[in-house]
């Protein structure tokens, strides 16, 4: 029986098979390449989908391995070291087992649990196991604001773990940073990692990034410098693996498992097609799922004894002065919008949103004045009502603001309400001062309030007293 074939199509298929064989090293395809082929084989082999339609299916071993990583409760159990001084919750033990399994397989891993589920304690448990059983050296990079919290957690949960802080806040004024040889864990900041060239000269066994969204932009000097630091295993800790765009995800995976999502050009081309191709999202999700462990506080299967978060929206009206400025700004914008277009028009809208926020905070912030009379702002008057109740109960309150210039006026206002001064924390607060504030605010002495800028106070603070 004869079957008619398309000669050009057969030729394309054979060429595709040859390209797959070329990917194999030592007669075996790497696990990373096998998973990349599943995500976007046409892009990886540089073959148009119009030219040849190729599908990829997993063998049983790869399928089982991926399913196991996606469901960490099924992983082989590894004992926690006796030198680790904490009792992990069940889901935290799963996270610990998952990190261990990823290290055995040689993969980078993203621990992306919701804020408050204990990413730090899981990581310390894993690092303590590595210190005792395999040794080596680990480098932890984090925002400067988190140094104090990590120090306290290490000394509490793994007191035998030798570590060194590689940061100017840990030195006397005349000292320079010297990397000591007899440590297991070295802790530095994103800013210092950019300056400490010697970090690239050490072959680290573990490279961990806390608040790893700091490398979401692949084009920055900071991101490029961190990706150049050599390490056998890379770990990212973040509650927000994707903040705004899918390119955030590519940069994260370029750090964790370089090449898994292709080049930035390949990934960009892939994501452009997702709008019209729902299957593409499913492929991408399946591709990254084994490398990201994310649990949410709202999932009762994860943590059942955590009370539900209670949100109460307090609505307020603008003062007469705020209303007048608001209307005035609207008229100004209307006039300018008719005269602008394109990127200039977009820029005008964005800058106007910021001005509206300032007016809603207090007219004096928008006008650049320093008086800040409470009666001129509906928000200030609403805040007074809330804080007077807190004062009567002798409780404590955290006030967050997007604007650093609002922290001092808010503190002055709260000082008047509570008849007692609280704390102000913003980007200019030193690491040492920040740690002292956190310790004192959580202590027995009554500190009624803390005003925090969002950027400086949005991550890494354990303020349980409020």
Feature-to-residue mapping (PLM):
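Charged, low-complexity intrinsically disordered regions
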Residues: 1-68, 249
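ASCE P-loop NTPase motor core, strongest for the SF2 helicase catalytic module
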Residues: 53-279, 283-466
């Amino acid at each position: 029986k004869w079957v008619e074939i398309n000669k050009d199509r057969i030729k394309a298929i054979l060429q595709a098979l040859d390209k797959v064989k070329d990917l194999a090293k030592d007669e075996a395809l790497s696990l990373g390449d096998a998973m990349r082929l599943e995500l976007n084989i046409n892009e990886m082999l540089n073959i148009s989908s119009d030219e040849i339609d190729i599908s990829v299916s997993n063998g049983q071993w790869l399928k089982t391995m991926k399913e196991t990583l996606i469901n960490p409760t099924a992983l082989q159990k590894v004992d926690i070291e006796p030198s680790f001084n904490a009792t992990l919750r069940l889901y935290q033990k799963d996270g610990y087992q998952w990190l261990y399994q990823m290290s055995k397989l040689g993969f980078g891993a993203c621990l992306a649990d919701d804020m408050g589920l204990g990413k730090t304690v899981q990581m310390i448990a894993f690092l303590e196991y590595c210190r005792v059983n395999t040794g080596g050296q680990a480098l932890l990079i984090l925002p400067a604001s988190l140094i104090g919290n990590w120090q306290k957690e290490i000394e509490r949960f793994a007191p035998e773990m030798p570590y060194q802080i590689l940061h100017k806040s840990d030195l006397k004024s005349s000292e320079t940073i010297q990397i000591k040889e007899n440590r297991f864990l070295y802790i530095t900041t994103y800013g210092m990692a950019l300056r400490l060239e010697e970090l690239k000269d050490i072959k680290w066994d573990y490279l961990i990034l806390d608040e790893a969204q700091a490398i979401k932009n692949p084009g920055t000097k900071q991101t490029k410098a961190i990706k150049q630091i050599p390490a056998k295993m890379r770990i990212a800790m973040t509650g927000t693996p994707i903040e705004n765009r899918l390119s955030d995800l590519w940069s994260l995976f370029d750090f964790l498992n370089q090449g898994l999502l292709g080049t930035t050009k390949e990934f960009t081309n892939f994501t452009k097609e997702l709008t019209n191709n729902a299957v593409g999202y499913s492929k991408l999700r399946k591709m990254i799922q084994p490398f990201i462990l994310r649990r949410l506080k709202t999932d009762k299967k994860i943590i059942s004894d955590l009370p539900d978060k209670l949100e109460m929206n307090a609505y307020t009206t603008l003062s007469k002065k705020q209303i007048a400025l608001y209307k005035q700004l609207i008229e100004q914008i209307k006039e300018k919008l008719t005269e602008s277009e394109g990127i200039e028009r977009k820029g005008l809208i964005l800058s106007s949103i910021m001005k509206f926020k300032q007016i809603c905070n207090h007219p004096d912030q928008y006008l650049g004045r320093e008086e800040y009379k409470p009666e001129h702002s509906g928000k200030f008057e609403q805040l007074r009502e809330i804080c007077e109740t807190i004062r009567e109960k002798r409780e404590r309150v955290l006030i967050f603001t997007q604007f650093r210039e609002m922290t001092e006026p808010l503190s002055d206002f709260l000082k008047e309400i509570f008849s007692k001064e609280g704390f102000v924390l913003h980007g200019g607060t030193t690491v040492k001062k920040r740690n002292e504030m956190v310790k004192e605010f959580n202590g027995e002495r009554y500190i009624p309030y803390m005003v925090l800028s969002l950027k400086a106070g949005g991550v890494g603070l354990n303020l349980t007293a409020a």
